[in-house]
Each structure stands twice: as C-alpha cells, then as structure tokens.
C-alpha cells in the first residue's frame, strides 16, 4: 500500500497555519496533485431494490456512439455510501475513537467542541453541522460515483406481483367490508448482476489511515438498497484494483467503463457475468493509464490482513485508531475554533 503514499495525505499534516491580515489562522492542508481510485464490482447475490418514489428500478440512458444508446441500472452514490459510512461509525465506536453521534445528525451545543461531533469518519466520508450559528462543512476526502450495471437494464431486472393481506391471511377488509385493492409490483435487480462503481480521492486529502478505514468500512458483503428486509445481505463487494497517479484518468469513470464494454460483440459472454474475468479486463485497461496500481489479489490480501488484525490484534489496532482520533480532533478544533481551541483544552 506504500506505493500510493505519493498520492495520499499525511495524518500529521492535516492543517496549515497561514498569516492573515491581522493574525495567523488555521485551515486544512492545501491540495496537491494526486489521485487514487478504488474500482469496485458490486455483485448482486440476492434481489436488490434501487428505486425512488416510482416502483421501477432507477436507470440512466448511456450514449454508446453512432446514435446508439441503452438504459442501464443506476444506483446513486448514497445507496452504497450511507451503509458503508454507517459501518465506519460502528468501527469507531468499537474502538472508542469517534462515532459519538448518529449519522447525519451531529448536534453541537455552544459548550461543545467540533471534535465532539467530527471524527475520522467525517474526514473520509464528509460531514456538516451548525455550531454557534456557523455552518461547519467538512468535504469528503472520498467521492463515490454512481454504480452502473455492466449490462443493459433489460438483462438485469425482474418484478414480482404482491398484495398486502390482512392478519387473517385474506384480502377482505373487516372494517370497510370490501376486498383490499392494495396490489403492487416489486421490481428488483436480479442476483448475478454486476455493477461497476469507483471511489476516488483527489488533492492528497486522504491519509493512509483513512484509506485503511475505508477498506474496513467497505467490507466484503452487506445489505443495500430499499426494502432490504425482504432479501437481507444482497451485495458482495469485489475490489477490482486500486490505481494512483498525479492526475485523474477518464478511463476510471464507470460511464466510460460501461461505454467501452457496450462495444463488446457478445453481451452474453462470461465477461459480463464472471467477476474474475471482468476484473482482469478492467485491470488490463486501467493499469496502462496509471502510474501505480494494486491488483485485485493484492487488495484482497491487504484487506484480509486488516480484517485479521481487527479480529486477532484488537488492542494494537485500537491504539492506532485512538492515536489518529487525537490528531483528527486537534485538526477540527483548530480549524473551526482557532485560538479558542487551545484555551478550551486548558
């Protein structure tokens, strides 16, 4: 993982002090050239529901050139970011290194400090709150892209017909003395569907500790989308590779990946259904256009080491998290409070 250090931030240099008109002030470290992208393959292992107010699965039309276009399943970033951000909070709570407040509901009183609400999760996934009439914005160091199916939508979705019965198992409403007309379709993404998503960090804002925390938060499998009580764990996540360089490359956009795959002659080829073949195809393309890379197997091994350490070397990892928590707390307090942070610490 050290190969990506030239494109990542430094947890000991999260902020910088500059000279203002009247006095010095603290602000986040200035951005520098550097980009790291995690290319993920999200595999549906049970029915998944990605929808808005309509019952149909969300989609987007992608132009494939020469006047051709098709609809693809589209899961917007928050469908995956929300549960993984939540898992990150749970990890911090276990280590007593953050996660003091619920996700999306940080409330700071005047007597509290920004670090009472902001933590490593805030640095990685972003956060915001209002404190003493000021809006405190923390931009995410990691950006989630849309997740797009590698095959057109009509290959990937299906629907089942349902009715909402009463407790006695019938459709007769005892109150109204009528039959229930509460009938509906449930559209879902079929098991076996593969979606591509890219998580990227730019400007050297994410420290190594943040990347490790992200890998733990992503995990291996989880429950995603709406109406998930129906299917439970429904997504297995595969990291196809990690790629770094001074500049971002257009080839890492999931839209570009899908456009390139659309030119394949046979949409029923194993490439669209087999994670290993798709992973190899993506790595062959992306490795050429980046300065450094880590293969899927290398990432699996590294992620496995993190998981193993989490389970068997808990105290050591807890110490690392708490040390990082102190540095991040100092960063947020000095950024948003300035000199008041030192006075409040005393």
Each language-model region and where it sits:
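RNA-binding basic/glycine-rich loop and surface signature characteristic of RAMP-family CRISPR effectors
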Residues: 1-346
């Amino acid at each position: 993982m050290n190969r990506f250090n030239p494109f990542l931030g430094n947890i000991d240099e999260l902020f910088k002090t500059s000279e203002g008109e009247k006095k010095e002030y603290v602000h986040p470290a200035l951005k520098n050239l550097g980009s790291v992208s995690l290319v993920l393959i999200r595999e549906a292992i049970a029915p998944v529901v990605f929808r808005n107010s309509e019952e149909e699965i969300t989609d987007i039309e992608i132009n494939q050139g020469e006047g051709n276009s098709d609809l693809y399943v589209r899961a917007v970033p928050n469908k995956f970011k929300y549960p993984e951000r939540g898992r990150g909070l749970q990890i911090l709570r276990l280590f007593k290194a953050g996660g003091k407040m619920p996700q999306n509901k940080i409330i700071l009183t005047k007597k509290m400090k920004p670090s009472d609400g902001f933590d490593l999760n805030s640095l990685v996934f972003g956060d915001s709150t209002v404190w003493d009439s000021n809006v405190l914005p923390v931009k995410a160091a990691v950006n989630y892209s849309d997740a797009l199916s590698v095959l057109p939508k009509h290959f990937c979705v299906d629907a089942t017909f349902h009715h909402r019965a009463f407790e006695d198992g019938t459709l007769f409403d005892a109150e109204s003395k009528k039959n229930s007309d509460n009938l509906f379709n449930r559209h879902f993404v079929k098991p076996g569907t593969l979606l591509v998503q890219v998580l990227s960090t730019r400007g050297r804002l994410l420290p190594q500790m943040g990347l490790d925390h992200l890998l733990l938060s992503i995990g291996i499998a989880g429950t995603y989308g709406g109406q998930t009580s129906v299917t439970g764990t429904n997504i297995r996540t595969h990291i196809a590779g990690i790629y770094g360089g001074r500049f971002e490359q257009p080839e890492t956009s999931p839209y570009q990946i899908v456009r390139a795959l659309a030119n394949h002659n046979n949409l029923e080829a194993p490439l669209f259904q087999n994670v290993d073949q798709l992973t190899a195809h993506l790595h062959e393309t992306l490795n050429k256009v980046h300065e450094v890379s880590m293969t899927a197997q290398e990432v699996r091994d590294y992620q496995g080491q993190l998981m193993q350490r989490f389970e068997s070397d808990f105290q050591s990892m807890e110490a690392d998290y708490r040390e990082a928590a102190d540095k991040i707390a100092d960063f947020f307090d000095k950024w948003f409070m300035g000199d008041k942070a030192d006075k409040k610490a005393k």
